[in-house]
């Protein structure tokens, strides 16, 4: 990448992130959210659970509790599962700068930072994925910034503000998508492996969801590359090409998951002894449909939320 292109990329990422950050804080000011009022995005589970977990982690930082085992967890228990699901985001380190009385403000700060980061990573994805299309013109740079901000403040990003740990997967997804694109088009698999590893480390649940999405995105990118490459190879050659790229994709994904094993494996071990719930594998074979097919279409309306019989997909 030339120096001018790198400069444009940095400007696009910073501009998209700053616009998103300022836009969200402007809305907080207008709607009187903390610190400008009494309203809070820490609602539902964030109010019932996450604030308590943040208070626990603040005690850990202050040397008043243990990250591995805590008596504040029910009657006492290992906390590695709680940490890896709720508290392993790199943004959580900013908690060191806040007091316990400022936890709601802290939640608002990391929400805006994570969504700003999502805008920056999506701008990075658009710039590198459509490199041939991006000629550096002001019009196309503005379009990249607009689309990046739109991604960050989409309904999913705003709706999941009360699930702050899920937003890490939101800003990591564009990097995984770019990694898939590079694997399909003969690039190095490092970006995909590292992105998957970080996504799982930051939140294993959303990291897993991103991995599932990556499988579908691989199929899309391969089909796109075949349709628009103008290549007229025989069917057997296409199958061989698909098998080779699929192998590189699987290898890259597995490498990422293995890297994340430093935290993921202890989490699995902790979950094995959890009595909070169980998985019925037989239910995976149940192909019944809850609700009507039309409810999926209704779920795309502005402000729609998922409920039993009516799913809102993103």
Where are these regions (language model features)?
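Periplasmic/ER-lumenal interhelical loops and adjacent helix-loop junctions
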Residues: 44-61, 90, 245-246, 253-314
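Transmembrane helix-loop junctions in multipass membrane proteins, especially transporters and channels
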Residues: 33-37, 100, 131-132, 186, ...
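Juxtamembrane loop-helix boundary motifs flanking transmembrane segments in multi-pass membrane proteins
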Residues: 46, 82, 101, 189-190, ...
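Active-site lumenal/periplasmic loops and adjacent helix-entry segments of GT-C-fold
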Residues: 29-130, 134-174, 198, 202-205, ...
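Membrane-interfacial, low-structure loops and terminal tails that flank and connect transmembrane helices
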Residues: 1-6, 133-137, 225-245
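Start-transfer (signal-anchor) and selected internal transmembrane alpha helices
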Residues: 1-33, 240, 244-249, 253
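Conserved helix-loop functional segments at active or binding sites
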Residues: 96-100, 132, 182-186, 295-306
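Membrane-embedded helix bundles of polyisoprenyl
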Residues: 21, 112-125, 139-224, 245-268, ...
């Amino acid at each position: 990448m030339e120096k001018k292109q790198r400069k444009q990329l940095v400007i696009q990422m910073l501009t998209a992130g700053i616009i998103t950050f300022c836009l969200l804080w402007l809305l907080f000011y207008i709607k009187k959210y903390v610190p400008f009022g009494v309203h809070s995005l820490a609602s539902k589970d964030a109010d019932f659970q996450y604030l308590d977990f943040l208070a626990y982690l603040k005690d850990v930082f202050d040397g008043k509790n243990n990250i591995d085992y805590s008596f504040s967890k029910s009657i006492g228990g290992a906390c590695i599962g709680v940490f890896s699901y709720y508290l392993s985001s790199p943004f959580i380190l900013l908690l060191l700068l806040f007091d316990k009385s400022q936890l709601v403000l802290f939640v608002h700060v990391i929400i805006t930072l994570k969504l700003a980061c999502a805008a920056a990573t999506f701008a990075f994805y658009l710039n590198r994925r459509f490199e041939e299309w991006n000629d550096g013109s002001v019009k196309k740079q503005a379009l990249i910034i607009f689309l990046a901000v739109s991604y960050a403040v989409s309904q999913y990003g705003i709706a999941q503000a009360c699930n702050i740990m899920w937003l890490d997967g939101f800003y990591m997804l564009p990097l995984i998508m770019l990694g898939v694109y590079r694997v399909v088009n003969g690039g190095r698999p490092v970006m995909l492996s590292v992105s998957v590893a970080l996504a799982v480390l930051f939140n294993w649940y959303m990291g897993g969801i991103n991995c599932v999405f990556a499988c579908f995105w691989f199929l899309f990118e391969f089909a796109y590359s075949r349709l628009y490459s103008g290549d007229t190879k025989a069917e057997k050659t296409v199958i061989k090409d698909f098998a080779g790229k699929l192998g590189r994709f699987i290898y890259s994904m597995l490498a990422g998951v293995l890297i994340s094993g430093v935290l993921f494996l202890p989490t699995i071990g902790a979950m094995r002894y959890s009595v909070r719930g169980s998985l019925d594998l037989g239910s995976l074979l149940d192909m019944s449909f809850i609700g009507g097919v039309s409810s999926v279409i209704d779920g795309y309306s502005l402000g729609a939320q998922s409920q039993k019989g009516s799913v809102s997909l993103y």
